[in-house]
């Protein structure tokens, strides 16, 4: 009951306080836009190694709280995953959307490797993911994310907890005295996911915490076969 309440409260908070993100350098601080965009790209599909289904489709609504500016920006998330073997999954992101005058495109892929004390107890996962953000007027981003997680069972709820790092390179199209031609950076984070069954779906909330930003995602996952 407590975890269900946390999920519901998180969803209400995201809807109540978030606002549409901007990808334009003339509307917000450049570093804020770039770092928040790359942090968003670091999200990955929560593929549970204990489940038997091979293909998953996951959609979510991500909100990033920028502590320096005290603002919330929201982004969509779409992930797909396919279990190749018991120990290995491949993931992909390939979607676009329209916001204001922009049409961002998210393209990427990754792998998740599962391991444990023996082949029957796969309660650890290691993930590497490359994701690019294209289609914008002012910049593009290429990012690589590494993370390692521990899966924990709590009754019907599953937890995924761990740490990770996001490395990115941004190239600017817009020229100006105060606009760098490129920005490179690294975002280290702590991660915690909570998932639980909801009818034929899996409902989850993801949190990624950094010293400057907090990312929260509400997602719905469907296992196809």
Question: Where do the language-model regions lie?
Answer:
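Outer-membrane beta-barrel domain signature
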Residues: 76-77, 82, 94-96, 101-102, ...
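Disordered, low-complexity tails and leader-like regions
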Residues: 2, 122, 200-201, 213
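Sec-dependent signal peptide recognition
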Residues: 2-12
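Glycine- and aromatic-enriched membrane insertion/assembly motifs of diderm outer-membrane
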Residues: 62-122, 129-130
